[in-house]
Design a protein with these regions (language model features):
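Viral virion structural and adsorption modules
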Residues: 1-5, 154-163
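Solvent-exposed edge beta-strands and adjacent loop segments
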Residues: 2-83, 128-142
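Hydrophobic side chains in beta-strands
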Residues: 14-15, 84, 114, 151
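Extracellular structured ligand-interaction cores
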Residues: 77-79, 109-111, 144-146
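Acidic glycine-/aspartate-rich tracts in secreted/extracellular proteins
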Residues: 86-89, 154
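Short, acidic/charged, Gly/Pro-enriched secondary-structure junctions
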Residues: 91-126
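Short intrinsically disordered coil segments
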Residues: 96-102, 144-148, 162-163
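Short beta-strand and beta-hairpin "edge-sheet" elements
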Residues: 113-158
């Protein structure tokens, strides 16, 4: 097939809302204020973004063979997990993003943009970054764990905004 792309070079940006519940059109950055690394420099994997639909059973009592369903609300359980290499630098940089979120007022949040290599669109979500947890640790392996975003709005694919 033609057109396949590699995950090498995925970029992750974020920006603070200036208008409540509205994706910013400027100000997206890859690095936390005062941070040393771009977010994508320590993220090793991204859980699927977007949501499935709940399915509601509307089977009438008279039905004797099959259930009937209708499409319900979108649902992703509200959680986006980013697998990360965890070390003092990545931890400090992620903490800086969490602190930027905590400093927002009037219910404003952060928007995250995920851009695939060569794509003209980014995938946008409004989300709250949670503090980094202590990772699972095993002998003979890299220290990796999840950093988590609590998604509260998904814009989906739209023209990328990279600065």
């Amino acid at each position: 097939m033609a057109g396949e792309i590699s995950s090498a070079g995925v970029a992750i940006y974020y920006a603070s809302e200036t208008t409540l519940n509205t994706c910013p059109s400027t100000g997206f950055k890859q690095k936390a204020t005062g941070g040393q690394l771009n977010i994508a420099d320590y993220i090793t994997g991204i859980s699927g973004l977007g949501a499935d639909y709940d399915m509601y059973d509307v089977t009438p009592l008279s039905e004797t063979v099959r259930h009937r369903f209708i499409k319900g609300l979108q649902n992703n359980d509200g959680s986006i997990e980013l697998n990360a290499n965890i070390n003092p630098t990545s931890r400090a940089d992620w903490d800086a993003i969490v602190d930027e979120f905590a400093a927002l007022t009037d219910g404003k949040s952060l928007w995250f943009e995920f851009v695939l290599p060569g794509d003209t669109d980014g995938f946008f979500v409004r989300a709250e970054p949670l503090p980094m947890r202590f990772p699972d640790v095993e002998a003979g392996s890299a220290v990796q764990g999840a950093v988590q975003l609590v998604e509260n709005k998904c814009k989906g694919f739209d023209t990328k905004i990279t600065a």
